[in-house]
Amino acid sequence: MANLKELVEFVENKRHTPDVICLLGNHDLSYFNGNGKCRFDYWQQEEVKELISNLNPQLYYVIGDLTPEIPNKYLFSHAGITKNWLDYNNLELKNLDNIDITNISPLDQVPYSRGGYSMYGSCIWNSLEDFQVQVPYKDYYQIFGHTWGGRTNPVIKKNYAMLDCCKPFVLNTETKQIEEWIL
């Protein structure tokens, strides 16, 4: 709870600048729709839900065409977005904006690899291993986490970066490089 309150305070202090975007994750979603309760605090549900709501979490965030010389589009999400999952649910990326997180939805699809019952994991439940064998969504460079697995370094490839390794990173929009953020 202390970490969540610290995060909310940090985000509130950064509201005047557009460089902090909060993404909705699998642990967050369970406080809204009551499904998939892993690491879920029943006795603090309403307070946690309110704090997470204050962060205005997004399911994804897109940055496009940062420089005209080398145009790129970056897609940020909690766990990576695949064409397989979107097609399986007859969704396009923009449809995610209309999902009601207070109800059970395709967001609750947990892949077999994570102990779930779905062939494809959602953008908050997918694993790195599943992402690697599926078709990434369109022509975006994807940046995501959700697959720590004890890693101490990020997994950075030509079409994606999985940054869940207990370190903060920033996307340098001038050099288009992912850099470790040193406080």
List each language-model region with its residue ranges.
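Core catalytic region of metal-dependent phosphoesterases/phosphodiesterases
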Residues: 1-54, 61
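Active-site-proximal loop/helix segment associated with metal-binding centers of metalloenzymes
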Residues: 43-50, 65-135
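Short hydrophobic beta-strand that contains or immediately precedes a catalytic carboxylate
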Residues: 24, 76-77, 162
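Short, surface-exposed beta-strand/loop micro-motifs that present aromatic residues
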Residues: 58-69, 170
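Short catalytic/ligand-binding loop motif for oxyanion handling, primarily in non-cytosolic enzymes
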Residues: 29-33, 77, 83-87, 150-153, ...
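Conserved beta-sheet core of the metallophosphoesterase superfamily
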Residues: 127-182
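Histidine-centered divalent metal-coordination motifs
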Residues: 26-27, 78, 143-148
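Short, conserved active-site loop motifs that form the nucleotide-linked donor/cofactor pocket
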Residues: 20, 59, 74, 160
